[in-house]
Design a protein with these regions (language model features):
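Membrane-water interface regions at transmembrane-helix termini and the short interhelical loops
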Residues: 1-15, 89-96, 167
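Residue-level recognition of membrane-helix boundary sites in multi-pass small-molecule transporters
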Residues: 6-7, 99-102, 160, 175-178
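Transmembrane helix-loop junctions in multi-pass membrane proteins
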Residues: 1-6, 121-132, 167, 174
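Membrane-helix boundary/coupling elements in multi-pass transport proteins
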Residues: 158-183
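Hydrophobic core positions of alpha-helical segments in small-molecule transporters
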Residues: 11-14, 103-106, 182
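Loop-to-helix junctions at membrane interfaces in multi-pass transport proteins
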Residues: 17-162
Length: 183
């Protein structure tokens, strides 16, 4: 229990749950606080200077031109997920086919939720944090946590827990990569 594959799996599960709760809760609270003031998401996007009609359309670029090549190439990203060494080793550890079915469903659900809500965070960030539109876009999740939990809710302890979720993502990947490279 103190090391090896089992320890990595246990810590990855705990860190993964922290990340999942954070990536689901933070944008939902931010959306609530955005819409409580009477602002809609599309109105917030328009106020931020983004062309909201094209911003929410997957087939258009920001300037209105077609984006089909970007969409097709973006679909290829999902194929690389199953070849990642730290993911592949988890599937190799499955005991039988019944567990493999559950493992696949869990992995697909995790990826769909995490990536879907990551996109939602990016879209919501333009409306909820308009000061980041032309600045530090990579800080959108951190700034969203700070605004929701320290400004709106006055709960800095919860903000700290969700900020730890970012560190959990880093540590989870690092220990999985170390395990794969050491074996």
């Amino acid at each position: 229990f103190l090391g090896g594959f089992t320890a990595v799996c246990v810590t990855d599960f705990i860190q993964g749950m922290l990340m999942l709760v954070g990536i689901l809760a933070v944008p939902l609270f931010a959306y609530h606080f955005l819409t409580t003031g009477g602002t809609t998401l599309s109105a917030g996007l328009e106020a931020s200077g983004a062309d909201s009609a094209n911003f929410l359309n997957l087939m258009k670029n920001g300037d209105g031109s077609n984006n089909i090549i970007s969409v097709i190439s973006g679909l290829g990203w999902g194929l690389g997920y199953f070849g990642m060494p730290h993911i592949l080793v988890r599937f190799m550890a499955v005991r039988d086919e019944k567990e493999m079915t559950k493992s696949k469903a869990t992995a697909i659900s995790w990826v769909a939720l995490s990536l879907g809500f990551a996109v939602f965070i990016g879209i919501l960030g333009r409306a909820y944090l308009p000061e980041l539109v032309n600045g530090n876009n990579e800080k959108v999740f951190i700034e969203m946590i700070k605004k929701v939990f320290t400004v709106e809710m006055r709960a800095p302890f919860i903000a700290g827990l969700f900020l730890c979720g970012i560190l959990a993502a880093i540590m989870s990947t690092a220990d999985s990569q170390l395990l794969v490279s050491a074996s």
